[in-house]
C-alpha cells in the first residue's frame, strides 16, 4: 500500500510563494498587454527527482510574446521539493497556466508522476 502513495512536488514556500514569484518576476511588455486580449498560456514541465525544472513546453498558447514570457518564468523556477512515490523521489509532471491581461492570474496543477 505504501508503495502506491504519491505526493506532489512542492515549490519552496508553497503555492502562494510560487504565484508571488511569477507575479514579481513577470515582464509585461506594453505590446504584449495591448495584444494579449483575454487568454491563458499553459506550460507543462517536469520537476525531476532532483527538484529541477526540465522539458518545459506549451500546452496552450495565447499570444507569442505572452507565451514566451510564461515559458521564461517557468524555466526560472528552481529548488522544488520533488514528488515522491512510495516514499522515494520521482519525476513529476506539472502544468502552470497564466494570464496577464487584464490582470495577472495563475494556477498550478500536479498532473502525475513518471
Predicted regions located by residue number:
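Charge-biased low-complexity segments
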Residues: 1-114
